[in-house]
């Protein structure tokens, strides 16, 4: 057995020096964000209260490649431990008795255990450069909050995190990790903001959602007196841009492996890990030089791609953000308390929404129990316990491998294992105990419009 064929590593000299920006390659322009009061496109300068100038410029840039600053590139290597490995899941292939080759890019080797550090370091750097003293953000499962807390510690920027209340209770060690890095962490809804107090008055046991936590973080920044900026973990173009370091590395690793993926898979909440892994490959599909299928996977409890409406909607629950054209369930949708906290969001990235509209990306949804079953199988075969979010991609990869077996086809399947689940074991405990519940909405708020 040639074990060298099952792990593909790059040297630190091969860590990408530029990010890939998909905007100039999309089949149509992304509809602009709108001012909800006027219905007119938002002037990018109006976002200056929330974001530093460099990130606003990246949000609308038409440059295909944007250089990674030297300080961020160094942090990717010395702090985030890039490059991350591309691994072949040979033991899973054997367990499935499939002719398919299954590969996964493993982002769980980063210090905070997920892909989120890739944009956290970039955002902390650009804010530090502009003299920002404090970053305020939301987090679902705590992966993003952990990453920004670590990045803040690295670049010397204070961090405040509003963590979705159900995850705050389900995943206490994520809070511990964030506080170890020096962050302030509050359960959302909280008593720190007007919007949070309003929701708690209505329901003292409110489980919260990413949309609510975003609202609280933005309200916090607006009332900060100018010494704080908002930091977002997904959805916006500059966030997805920073994540393309994943796919750009994977391109080189697949060349080393001597194969090219027929199917690429990623889990989707807002879209950053899916985009980071697939966008560098999607550019070839858009140019007609590739026929790779791209599968975006979401929970049936939060089915924005499979049951949502492609329309303008707020990015947060309180309606503080500009209106974004995206696949959405409606910003008032109350996402059930599933364990994949990072996927509990009502919309998806505008760039991903365009790709869904044009059929470049396929969408698929699963119940959480079948996702945990797939993650259990993967853990026993490969030794890695996937984050509940990443486990959605594992489930789709297994399904595609079984389909290949049944049809007698050899296909190359690749997915992004965006994080480990070692701080998400409560969900696995409930799965093993048989108490894990499935959720699926009967009605979608956005469909009532």
Swiss-Prot record:
What are the record keywords, sorted? Amino-acid biosynthesis, Aromatic amino acid biosynthesis, Lyase, Pyridoxal phosphate, Tryptophan biosynthesis
Q: Which cofactor does it need?
A: pyridoxal 5'-phosphate
Q: Could you tell me which InterPro entries the record lists for this protein?
A: Trp_synth_b-like, Trp_synth_b_CS, Trp_synth_beta, Trp_synth_beta/beta-like, TrpB-like_PALP, TrpB-like_PALP_sf
EC numbers for this chain: 4.2.1.20
Pathway given for this chain reads: Amino-acid biosynthesis; L-tryptophan biosynthesis; L-tryptophan from chorismate: step 5/5
Naming one, the record's GO cellular component terms include: cytoplasm
Keyword match Lyase? yes
Give the matching CDD domains.
Trp-synth_B
Post-translational modification N6-(pyridoxal phosphate)lysine, affected residues: 116
Judging by the UniProt lineage, the source's domain of life is Archaea
What SUPFAM superfamilies has UniProt attached to this entry?
A: Tryptophan synthase beta subunit-like PLP-dependent enzymes
Matching Pfam families: PALP
GO terms (molecular function) for this protein are:
L-serine hydro-lyase (adding indole, L-tryptophan-forming) activity; pyridoxal phosphate binding; tryptophan synthase activity
* Reactions the enzyme catalyzes: (1S,2R)-1-C-(indol-3-yl)glycerol 3-phosphate + L-serine = D-glyceraldehyde 3-phosphate + L-tryptophan + H2O
Record has Phosphoprotein as a keyword: no
Subunit structure of this chain's protein:
Tetramer of two alpha and two beta chains.
Family (UniProt): Belongs to the TrpB family.
This molecule's function is given as: The beta subunit is responsible for the synthesis of L-tryptophan from indole and L-serine.
| Listed name of the protein | Tryptophan synthase beta chain 2
Q: Which organism is it from?
A: Aeropyrum pernix (strain ATCC 700893 / DSM 11879 / JCM 9820 / NBRC 100138 / K1)
């Amino acid at each position: 057995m040639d074990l060298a064929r099952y792990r593909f590593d790059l040297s630190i000299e091969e860590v990408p020096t530029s990010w890939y920006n998909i905007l100039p390659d999309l089949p149509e322009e992304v509809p602009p964000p709108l001012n909800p009061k006027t219905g007119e496109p938002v002037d990018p300068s109006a976002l200056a209260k929330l974001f530093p100038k460099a990130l606003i410029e990246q949000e609308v840039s038409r440059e295909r490649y944007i250089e990674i600053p030297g300080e961020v590139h160094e942090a990717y290597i010395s702090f985030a431990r890039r490059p991350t490995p591309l691994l072949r899941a040979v033991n899973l292939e054997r367990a499935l008795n499939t002719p398919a080759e299954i590969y996964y890019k493993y982002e769980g080797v980063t210090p905070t255990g997920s892909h989120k550090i890739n944009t956290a370091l970039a955002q902390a750097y650009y804010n530090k450069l502009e003299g920002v003293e404090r970053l305020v953000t939301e987090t679902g499962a705590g992966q993003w909050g952990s990453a920004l807390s670590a990045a803040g510690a690295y670049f010397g920027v204070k961090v405040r995190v509003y963590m979705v209340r159900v995850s705050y209770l389900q995943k206490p060690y994520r809070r511990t990790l964030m506080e170890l890095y020096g962050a302030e962490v509050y359960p959302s809804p909280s008593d720190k903001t007007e919007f949070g107090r309003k929701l708690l008055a209505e329901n003292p046991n409110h489980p919260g959602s990413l949309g609510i936590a975003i609202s609280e973080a933005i309200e916090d920044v607006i009332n900060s007196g100018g010494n704080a900026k908002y930091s977002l973990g997904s959805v916006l173009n500059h966030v997805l841009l920073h994540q393309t370091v994943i796919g750009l590395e994977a391109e080189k690793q697949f060349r080393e492996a001597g194969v090219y993926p027929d199917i690429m898979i990623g889990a989707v909440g807002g879209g950053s890990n899916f985009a980071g892994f697939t966008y560098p490959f999607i550019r070839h599909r858009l140019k007609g030089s590739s026929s790779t299928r791209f599968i975006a996977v979401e929970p049936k409890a939060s089915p924005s791609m499979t049951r949502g409406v492609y329309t303008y909607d707020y990015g947060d629950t309180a309606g503080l953000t500009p209106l974004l054209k995206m696949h959405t369930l409606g910003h008032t949708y109350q996402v059930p308390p599933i364990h994949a906290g990072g996927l509990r969001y009502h919309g998806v990235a505008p760039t991903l929404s365009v790709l869904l509209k044009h059929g470049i990306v396929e969408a698929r949804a699963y119940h959480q129990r079948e996702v945990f079953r797939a993650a259990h199988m993967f853990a026993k075969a490969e030794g890695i316990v996937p984050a509940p979010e990443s486990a959605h991609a594992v489930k789709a990869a297994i399904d595609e491998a079984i389909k290949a077996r049944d049809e007698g086809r050899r296909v190359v399947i690749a997915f992004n294992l965006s994080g480990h689940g070692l701080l998400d074991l409560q969900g696995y405990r409930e799965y093993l105990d048989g108490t894990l519940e499935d959720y699926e909405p009967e009605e979608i708020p956005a469909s009532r419009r």
